[in-house]
């Protein structure tokens, strides 16, 4: 049996020039955010407590708790809203197609019976309010001419709805049934976010014109604005009220977050605190989302980093939560410290995770796309979609300065002889391999066939190269760093995708694009375990347990399968739906724990119980 131990989640999806709208539930102290086709439910009391909902067919844009916390409404780029339970396996209550295009925001009414959604209507309705159980429309929302970026339900009687969008307008509706009441054009650029105060007396809008406007919650009349003296110098993307309705938190493209004191009558808002951040100096420091929930002030940067401040002590350094935004392509576990996991994503981000803790630190490689990662205790090697192989030293505080070498070809696979004195690296390309000592090219060898995968033995004395034709070519590595072919093995019916040696070097395993894996005896060159055909699609990754007894495979069919070498393949252990969109990498942490990563940009740890 495979049991999920931990999830190291991705961070919210972000888009430059647009804000994101995160939300939460004050009773359970959990937050909701979206990435890809998944909604992530994350506890602020226990940060390792993460749940994932992945039933949308398209990228999810927004998710909100119902007032009683029992239901969640989430929406996607197709205009679909799904209402599902927070308990008992996320049971689906209803699904409605509410807009013709992307939903940018949605809100529940305070009684939990109605939902309003806004976004891109593609020439049709831009805002719609409907009953949560039947989907019946509750009114007409005229007045907007372009995409409606945000909407808000008044949290007290009488019912009111306020909206804002790309036409620079703030519109106000009363009902139900809802009908147009008034419109305001105080803003001179996109109005990015609109939020009612918890007591319902006011609502506030923030805009790319660097301004915030305050309106009466019942009549919709403008009553004040945020003072500009100490205000933001860039577009304001999001705003969130304090639980007592006296203060607001705003975030901006100027890389700052500010806390404002709002007068009781709403006539003015004044900055009382500008929150401090550690900046990397790049555009990823721009702040695009925020949430004030209980004692937590949460900000989200363009790079996805979530900073958690305490409302009681805003001078206290924030707790940082980070991770990947894009799909995780490769994993490595540091040998002597098997609680440390390294992961990389194709957008150039390398993240260090600690088992039982989660996020530790990260390194953003500028202008580099990463496809493969291999590691020793002292350094990591990465390769991407150009001709470069990078070496990055590992330090106590994170990472050292990166260096690279141009091998003249796009790398396909990379492996390191971790037990050899020189820590030789083998890098394969489309027609051959390169042997590296650090960043020194020892030899470049054209093998005369189409290469698909490769590996070098931990002692550096042997290499195996797999071809597009499914053949395994075994080479001895000579003292002059040349390769001598010793054998050719034929069993696979598809191009090789991955080859790995067992830790004790008595076996090796291979996987192919035709969903088959094979375990081989290294000495006899005979098949030791076959019929490993239980994936339904291409195998992307393969790993051995430290005790040499198990092999794990990951596939684009979303499953991780673990085979026991001394048992028939039919007695496999399967983690189904391990990663939405497919599994890209697997690695053993210890004899009974497997790490996996995939298209959902997350890393998961699984406890494996042998049959």
Curated annotation (Swiss-Prot):
Q: Where is the signal peptide?
A: none
Q: What does this protein do?
A: Binds actin. Enhances the F-actin depolymerization activity of actin-depolymerizing factor (ADF) proteins.
* Alphabetized InterPro entries for the sequence: WD40/YVTN_repeat-like_dom_sf, WD40_repeat_CS, WD40_repeat_dom_sf, WD40_rpt
Q: In which tissues is it expressed?
A: Expressed in flower buds and flowers.
Alphabetical GO CC annotations of the entry are: Cul4-RING E3 ubiquitin ligase complex; cytoplasm; pollen tube
Supply one GO BP term: actin filament depolymerization
- Does the keyword field hold Repeat? yes
Read off the CDD domains from this record: WD40 (cd00200)
SUPFAM superfamilies, alphabetically?
WD40 repeat-like (SSF50978)
User: What gene makes this protein?
Assistant: AIP1-1
**Presence of the UniProt keyword Repeat in the record:** yes
MF-aspect GO terms: actin filament binding
Q: Where are this protein's WD repeats? A: 3-43, 55-94, 98-142, 143-183, 186-225, 231-270, 282-319, 323-363, 446-485, 491-530, 534-573, 578-611
Q: What is the lineage of its organism?
A: Eukaryota, Viridiplantae, Streptophyta, Embryophyta, Tracheophyta
Disulphide bridges in this chain?
none
| UniProt feature coiled coil, ranges | none
Name assigned to this protein: Actin-interacting protein 1-1
